[in-house]
């Protein structure tokens, strides 16, 4: 089960790094900065890095890889779409609050808005993320779009999602560097005080987290098989007339770990065979 174990290593590593990134952000603002608050001061600004890291980076990363979790392959595709969209919506709400915090802080302190490259790219990627969310729900979650349209737009949907995710991480790295340059005076950033080392390490953590997420979602062997393949691999599915035959296709809570591992590995082998034969669509 080499493929399954490799996936688990990547998955656990990414989750640990993502969670560690959130912890690093909290330690940064609570220990070295002014803490958290909502009074128009620096403590309100500190919500910006905390919410961007936890929502726009960590939760978005989970939303991207949720289809790759083998133990969810017995869940219905519709259920997974709701989970995928729900996680993205949660990340978007976090991001909006983060934007409100930084604009509120700037306005309270008479600091100009939207003058840095960080702010330009940051606002652009938020708008693109909102557009991606609206189009994704309209095309893939609501039952109005044709299957041909969904299949045709899937490569664009995947590419734009990964592009947005990578841009978010790059923008976050720009932002934390900008914050350190502005904030560290005695000693300056160039002298590498403990805060600088700590925050630089935080930047490396979210960078590696993003790399692991992209690797997992672009590895063909770890792709969720189509619904027909899942049913073929699972002998206990409901019959066409609706009679019960021990189906787990819509209930993923009772699947044994050994069955998940077996089915996931068999599914990957099936996917690779289809890829080699040129039979598999972009879905």
Swiss-Prot record:
Amino acids binding heme b 1: 48, 113-116, 118, 178
Extracellular topological domain residue ranges: 31-45, 104-116, 178-195
Annotated Cytochrome b561 domain residues: 13-218
Keyword line: Cell membrane, Electron transport, Heme, Iron, Membrane, Metal-binding, Oxidoreductase, Translocase, Transmembrane, Transmembrane helix, Transport
Residue sites binding L-ascorbate per the record: 77, 81, 150
Bias kind Polar residues: ranges: 235-253
Protein's UniProt keywords contain Metal-binding: yes
Molecular functions (GO terms): identical protein binding; metal ion binding; transmembrane ascorbate ferrireductase activity; transmembrane monodehydroascorbate reductase activity
EC number(s) per entry: 7.2.1.3
Record region (Disordered): 234-263
Annotated cofactor note: Binds 2 heme b groups non-covalently.
Reactions listed under catalytic activity: Fe(3+)(out) + L-ascorbate(in) = monodehydro-L-ascorbate radical(in) + Fe(2+)(out) + H(+); Cu(2+)(out) + L-ascorbate(in) = Cu(+)(out) + monodehydro-L-ascorbate radical(in) + H(+); monodehydro-L-ascorbate radical(out) + L-ascorbate(in) = monodehydro-L-ascorbate radical(in) + L-ascorbate(out)
CDD domains reported for this sequence: Cyt_b561_CYBRD1
Predominant location category: membrane
Location within or outside the cell: Cell membrane; Apical cell membrane
Topological domains annotated Cytoplasmic: 1-5, 68-76, 143-149, 221-283
Bilayer disposition of the protein: Multi-pass membrane protein
Cited InterPro entries: CYB561/CYBRD1-like (IPR043205), Cyt_b561/ferric_Rdtase_TM (IPR006593)
Function description: Plasma membrane reductase that uses cytoplasmic ascorbate as an electron donor to reduce extracellular Fe(3+) into Fe(2+). It is also able to reduce extracellular monodehydro-L-ascorbate and may be involved in extracellular ascorbate regeneration. May also function as a cupric transmembrane reductase.
Name of the protein described by the UniProt record: Plasma membrane ascorbate-dependent reductase CYBRD1
Taxonomic classification: Eukaryota, Metazoa, Chordata, Craniata, Vertebrata
Gene: cybrd1
